[in-house]
């Protein structure tokens, strides 16, 4: 938990693939983010716990996606959030969820499952995930967020991987879906591929949802 002591500051929940979120939090401070608390969640089985349903791996012999996001979301809502917020001096002004790559997919998927999160930042989200855009189009959102941030690296479509190469089209489709539902949304295109300045990209998303 990385906290700035301010009256009723927002709390943002961030699943991380490694580390404890310190690098992202430091980038947020460099961007002059308003006071907020960042709760980083590590120790995840990334492909299993952040994927909404089962799916083959992105390349032959790669680890498949386990489709256990619902279980992780239950743990987040039932255990992680209550424990994190019990240490705060006051209840949060609002809650957000953020994520990079597959965690960015999870953050958006959560809007169709719960109304706990009022703002979402998905940086280089894995929106190529098979079936997700259709899932989002065909179902009613449980939450109507106050702001949604999307981003992608400009070179992320330059991949031989057939599953991933349409990620820009999928991200634009998600942007359009939110705009059609009158949800304030932005899509930021960053230089580089999927692995360029990941902490800064995530921090830019958090900054945007904190200031919009």
Which functions belong to the PLM regions below?
Residues 109-119:
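Conserved hydrolase catalytic core segment
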Residues 9-75, 79-87:
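Serine-hydrolase catalytic machinery in alpha/beta-hydrolase-like enzymes
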Residues 127-197, 203-209:
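The feature captures the conserved acid-bearing segment of alpha/beta-hydrolase catalytic domains
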Residues 94-99, 123:
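Short beta-strand immediately N-terminal to the catalytic nucleophile in serine-hydrolase-like folds
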Residues 98-103, 107:
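Gly/Ala-rich beta-loop-alpha elbow adjacent to hydrolase catalytic centers
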Residues 28-29, 111, 175:
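A conserved amphipathic alpha-helix that caps or lines the catalytic cleft of carbohydrate-
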Residues 14-17, 124, 152:
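The conserved beta1-alpha1 loop
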Residues 1-4:
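A short loop-to-beta-strand scaffold at the N-terminal edge of the catalytic core in hydrolase folds
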């Amino acid at each position: 938990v990385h906290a700035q002591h301010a009256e009723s500051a927002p709390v943002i929940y961030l699943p991380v693939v490694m580390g404890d979120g310190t690098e992202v939090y430091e980038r947020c401070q460099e961007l002059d983010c308003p006071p907020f608390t960042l709760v980083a969640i590590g120790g995840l089985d990334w492909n299993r716990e952040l994927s909404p349903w089962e799916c083959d791996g992105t390349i032959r012999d790669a680890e498949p996606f386990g489709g256990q996001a619902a279980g992780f979301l239950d743990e987040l809502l039932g255990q992680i959030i209550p424990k994190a917020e019990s240490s705060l001096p006051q209840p949060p002004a609002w809650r957000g969820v953020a994520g990079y790559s597959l965690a960015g997919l999870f953050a958006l998927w959560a809007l169709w499952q719960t109304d706990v999160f009022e703002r979402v930042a998905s940086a280089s989200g894995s929106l190529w995930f098979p079936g997700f855009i259709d899932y989002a189009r065909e179902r009613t959102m449980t939450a109507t967020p106050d702001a949604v941030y999307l981003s992608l690296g400009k070179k992320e479509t330059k991949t031989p991987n057939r599953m991933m190469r349409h990620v820009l089209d999928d991200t634009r489709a998600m942007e359009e879906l939110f705009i059609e539902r009158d949800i304030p949304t932005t899509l930021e295109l960053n230089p580089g591929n999927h692995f360029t300045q990941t902490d800064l990209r995530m921090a830019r998303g958090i900054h945007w949802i904190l200031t919009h």
